[in-house]
Amino acid sequence: MDWEEYKKWGKKGIDWGYDYRKNLRKLPVRSQLNPGDVFNKIPNEPPEKPEKIEKIINDFEQLIMPGITHWQHPRFFSYFPSNAAPSSVLAEIFTNTMSPMCMLWQTSPAATELEEKIIDWFKISLGLPMGFNGVIQDSATSATLSAVLTMREKALNRSGNQKGLFNQ
């Protein structure tokens, strides 16, 4: 795919996303397929040549979509569907187009400084002192692990990392 095709199909993708979210309520929350239904429809050998985007999109709609649990469905009550507001989806287009590596200031100064400013805004919004420090976890799982490790360290008077649970 070249950038001209990207533009054409990107617009179609945005239209697809709009239609999907507008009609999501009409879909079943969970897939109605049985285990192996999707797997058995996928060829055993990879294609020898690149497939046309039309075929890939058709496969997506006919093969993949029936096997999807719709996490953003209004009747899906598991976990936390908090990452797919229209603004988040649009932001993903920008970030995925650039594909920046934002792990250090040197690799992406703007991303680092934007993150710092947003954290300052969180502090203001939550009434925290500006000197307050913390970490925003990426999932409930890592947040729970972090909380458990923090509780362990507090209970062991900050010696758990060096001595372990049994002072060994």
Where are these regions (language model features)?
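N-terminal entrance/gating region of PLP-dependent enzymes' catalytic architecture
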Residues: 1-131
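Conserved beta-loop-alpha segment that forms the PLP phosphate-binding cup at the N-terminus of a helix
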Residues: 115, 119, 133-160
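Short, intrinsically disordered, charge-balanced linker/junction segments flanking boundaries
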Residues: 159-168
